[in-house]
Amino acid sequence: MRSAVLVLVALAVVACKGSDGGSGTGSPGGGSGGGTSAVGTGSGAQPDPSADDQSRFDQERQPNEIVASLGLKPGMVVADVGAGTGLLTVHVARAVFPGGHVVATDIDAAVLDYLSARMEAAGFDSIVEARQVSPTDPGLEPNTYDLILLAQVDHYFDDRVAWLTKAAPALRAGGRLAISNRMQNRAPAFAAAESVGFHVVTEVNDVPGQFVALFELNP
């Protein structure tokens, strides 16, 4: 059971990241979603997957539009990188249910506690695995994933090209890389992906000021 101090630190980290999201290698907890709440004030404080956090995220970030552009289907295996507290992860899990699996990664173990609580509350704890990874290692098994999702997180990587080079072997044949971010991060994201050997398949700009691009590895 985590101390109140640890909970408050996690909350402070997430609050600082609220404007950008994303954990990657720079800031922990919140690429796909970073809101948190806590129950209690003493040493027994517990993660609380607040419905208010989810509602606010859904309104501001329009995750249904993002997920709809990913082409997810039941049974798919997805890596949600820099998943934070799971505000987007819950939508991804819903899209691959039943039969699918989501590995939600982050560099912050405390933030992943909130993600696990959110998945349990939503009924997706059986298909979502919270996984702590290092800042420079994707921590993904080779030849496993139908989709690797980077949602407002790649701009935190110290070296996009190095990270993508390590992540690419985790994709199955025909698997895709999805990058969703604000428009000011589009050019470096595309440049990094293309330098690793990806080419863009589709790009959607349904959410104002944001892009969602799907990439596949060159033959």
Regions found by a protein language model. Give the residues of each.
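Bacterial signal peptide processing site
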Residues: 17-20
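Conserved class I S-adenosyl-L-methionine
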Residues: 75-84
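Conserved SAM-binding strand-loop segment of SAM-dependent methyltransferases
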Residues: 123-136
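A short glycine-rich, Lys/Arg-flanked "PGG" loop and its adjoining helix->strand segment in the class I
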Residues: 93-94, 161-176
